[in-house]
Structure formats: structure tokens, C-alpha cells
Amino acid sequence: ESVKFWAKEYHIDGFRFDLMGIHDIDTMNQLREELLKIDPTIFVYGEGWVAADSPLPFEQRAVKENVRKMKGIAVFNDEFRDGLKGSTFDEQEPGYASGNINGHFEPVKYGIVGGTQHPQVDYSGLLYCDGPYAAAPSQMINFVSCHDGYTLVDKLKLSVQGEHSEEELVPIDKLIHTVLLTSQGIPFIRGGEEIMQDKQGEPNSYKSSDAVNQIDWALKAKNRDIFNYIRTLIALRKKHPAFRIPTAEGLEKWLHFLDTGDSGVIAYTLGEYANGDEWKEILVAYNGNRNQADINIPEQDWIIVCHNGQIDLDSQEHLSGGDISIAASSALILYRQ
């Protein structure tokens, strides 16, 4: 009744449930059905876990493992979060994008396919679960930081190994957002993340002052390069439906991972004008290593959209394929017409 009131009287168009797992599946489904009657575009999502134990039997809990039973409801993808940036529970552990490839390869791929079933993902290599739990990519929210825990830049300061300045974290930050905004599913960005906002190293800032929690708008000028980079990634995603495939069947048909050997690079193609895209084939590759990596890609007349930390949707720079090098902590996005 409360949710219906907020939707009708205040026209709230999205509801996020903290610790959604303490609710039962039937209640969440009833809530979703009632909201559909008011406005079918209302978005419902939540944390697909509980803080401790619950008297509800596991099969009745509205947790991520049961999200297939909750059509039209999405959950946060903690596999992708911790695979990409490093453990939320160990502040010093780096993730895939910070050079910690082993143990984080498959969780990142899991996010790329929106938490759905895909024949090229090894689900035994995941961090917290042993299989796909989303029926469709729209049930999966990929993210790396939110109000809980460290901001992304604070986490990187703590976990990236070796001496480094904040400026030296920019390539890793760009790589993380490239993976986030080119993966299937729903991308989630914490406010301020796009300008490298920190919280002065405070992981639990609900009790902190505005000096810690407010957005420092001067960072938009200081970090204009990464702001523009992320803005262009968003434009790429909005323009190209290949990055927004709606079904698991479509992902299995159009998204294919490339064999990159032991390079540590994750690479895949989106082919056959995926999901009605104007580009015939798109190739995306991520190098999480802290050094250059070499891979082999199909020999085609590719046009370079993103490389070496730069992105240009109107680029006319060509690449013929074959053996190529990808700069440390960077992504490569190509397409052919």
C-alpha cells in the first residue's frame, strides 16, 4: 500500500529495496504486479541478500539466487563488483582491472553477459555463486560502487599495488567504467563516480558530515578528461542496441568470447548486427594487466572507437586485425560495417 501511494501521489518511478532478501518472493511479485497497473515503466530492484540469517526458508527469500522467480525485478551483481574492482570485504585486494587477473576473470565475464546462462562462461570460477541467476539481462544491475562501502577511487587508492599518484589511477578508473558501460544488463553509477569523487577514505559515511559526503564540483574541472570519457561511453551505449541485448537467447546468439590464451585479456564480439545495431560486428577487449598485452583478433577492416584511454565515436582510424597490442589497464573497442 505504501509503494502504491508513493507511485500514485508522488509519481515515483523507481523503488530500491535494501536487503530485499528479508522479503518473500510472493510479496515482491505482488508489489511488482500492482505497480505495473499504475505504470509499466516503474523500475523495481534491490539488494539480493540478507544481512544475517532469516526465518524464511531460502527458497522463499527474495534473494539473487531466486530472481528468476521474480519477473520484472532486478538485483545488484556483487560478482561483477568484486571481480572488477576487488573484494568489498578486503580493502587491500585488487580486482581484475587493477591487475589481479586470477580468480576474477570469470566474475567479470559473468557481468558481461548480464548474469545469464552463456556457454562460454565457467560458472565454477565465480566468487559467491555457482551458476547464472538472471533469466534476462534486465534482472542484473552491474556496478562497482554505491552509497555503501568505499567510493571507487578510495578503493583503488587502497588496493592498487605499488607507489602511485591519483592521476596514475585514471587508466584503471577508465577501464572499469568501460567494462561497466559495455556490459549487458543495467549499468549503475554512484553519483560523483564520474568525476573521481572520494569520501576521504571513509567506507561507511552515513554518520559523516557534508564535508565527506557532498559532491565536490571542482573535481569536474580537475577530472574533466574522465568525465568526458564516461559521458561518451554512455552515448555509445545509448546509440548502439548491441550493448543492450534483452534476452539470454540473444546473448548466446550474438555475443562470442575470443580465445585470448593466457594473456589476461577478456575479448568478445557482438556480431550479425546484434539486436538491430547499425554496426555489423563490434569487438571489445579489456586488458586488466598493469602492462601491455598481446592478442590475436580476426583479420577484418576494423574502425577504432576506443583505445589507449581515448574514445571517439566518429573515428575513421582503421586497424586490419591479426596480432595486436593493448596498452596496460585499457580497453579496445572496434567495429566493422
Feature locations, PLM:
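The substrate-binding groove and active-site-proximal loops of carbohydrate-active enzymes
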Residues: I12-H23, K157-E168, Q214-K220
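Non-transmembrane alpha-helical segments in soluble domains
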Residues: V3-A7, R32, I141-V144, H177-L181, ...
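Active-site neighborhood of glycoside hydrolase catalytic domains
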Residues: E1-P55
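Carbohydrate-interacting/catalytic domains
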Residues: E167-V170, L181-Q337
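A short acidic (Asp/Glu
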Residues: T27-N29, P55-P57, Q200-G201, I295-N296
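Pore-domain-biased detector for 6-TM cation channels and related repeats
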Residues: K8-H11, F80, Y268
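Conserved alpha/beta catalytic core and glycan-binding cleft of carbohydrate-active enzymes
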Residues: R32-E34, I38-M196, N204-Y206, D262, ...
